[in-house]
Amino acid sequence: SRTAREVVGIDYSQAFIDAANGMRAAGTARVSRLEEASLQSELEVAVPRGVCPERITFEQGDAMDLRGDLGNFDRVLAANLLCRLREPAKLLARLPDLVKPGGELVLTTPCTWLEEFTPPANWPAADTSAWLKSELDESFELTAEHDEPFLIRETARKFQWTVAMLTVWRRR
């Protein structure tokens, strides 16, 4: 973190947490990326300058069942997560406890609701934006909403272009 006193990163994947902890400890990591077929290239990635890794912790966790003593924060980011949860409403219900009054909640989602991740009964009844407003309005005020494009490299010649909906909320 450059500015926050404390950052807690949580992911469901223990492999992602192990990789993040390795980067935090070493400052760099060697990674392989697929070029084509079975051809790979090696890269070295580094923690950006000015980041204070000693302020950051990483832990494995389930966004629908976060530990009770996690505390609350000035800012919470849930990135590209909602439409990958079996019960996304569970996370939304927990968010008021995680964000301090006056704090900020940032949600991004590509709104790609798929049965393999979320049963259709748990999808928004309307569009995702309207659903979020109805679920969060009691505890949060929507302060911004816009599209946030991102690109995922699959191979040297194949990329996945996606546009996520980004919403920013202020805790009442």
Feature-to-residue mapping (PLM):
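S-adenosyl-L-methionine
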Residues: 22-66
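A conserved beta-strand element that flanks and buttresses the S-adenosyl-L-methionine
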Residues: 77
